[in-house]
């Protein structure tokens, strides 16, 4: 249990790029948070009232699927605290996964651009704007110890690993969620239970 799939499709209006998918093992804290919120939202059964029914904010979808049960809600924005918390968590996971894909590409094609990307990631980690960093830790670790990568990039990667390890230890000793709700960005996310 704990296998999670992150799937991203290109911008629906421009249809640029290819769909991407990655599987990773979500932390127990994240799994628990997602399923507690999903349960509070009745496993996404029924209709959800949104603050912006004309779609100016960008549509979001949440899906719960287990066996023959498949529930989905679509919304633009919501004042519901559980929806906000779940949206924020999925946004942070999405940002983390996108960084992983970008770092992999830069490592292969443009190692000199890694330093700027890693520095930006460091700022987001410090502000706790990423979630499930463990999913992309292997690529960051590979950068940190790859002698073909410029030293500045390797140093940023090592610092990033150290900071995320510190935050992981801090979260492990706390039962509180590691994020707080604030302004949300458009996204698409799927919550799916895996056995």
What are these regions (language model features)?
Residues 24, 28, 80-83:
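Generic detection of long, well-ordered alpha-helical segments
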């Amino acid at each position: 249990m704990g296998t999670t799939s992150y799937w991203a499709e290109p911008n629906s209006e421009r249809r640029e790029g290819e769909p991407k998918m990655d599987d990773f093992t979500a932390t127990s804290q994240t799994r628990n948070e997602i399923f507690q919120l999903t349960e509070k939202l009745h496993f996404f059964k029924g209709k959800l009232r949104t603050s912006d029914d004309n779609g100016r904010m960008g549509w979001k979808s949440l899906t719960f699927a287990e066996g023959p049960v498949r529930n989905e809600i679509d919304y633009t924005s919501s004042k519901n605290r559980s929806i906000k918390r779940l949206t924020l968590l999925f946004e942070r996971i999405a940002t983390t996964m996108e960084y992983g894909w970008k770092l992999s590409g830069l490592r292969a094609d443009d190692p000199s651009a890694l330093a700027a990307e890693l520095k930006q990631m460091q700022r987001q980690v410090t502000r706790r704007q990423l979630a499930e960093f463990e999913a992309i830790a292997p690529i960051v670790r590979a950068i940190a110890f790859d002698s073909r990568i410029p030293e500045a990039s390797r140093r940023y990667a090592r610092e990033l690993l150290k900071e995320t390890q510190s935050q992981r230890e801090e979260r492990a000793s706390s039962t509180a969620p590691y994020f707080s709700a604030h302004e949300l960005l458009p996204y698409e996310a799927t919550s799916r239970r895996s056995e």
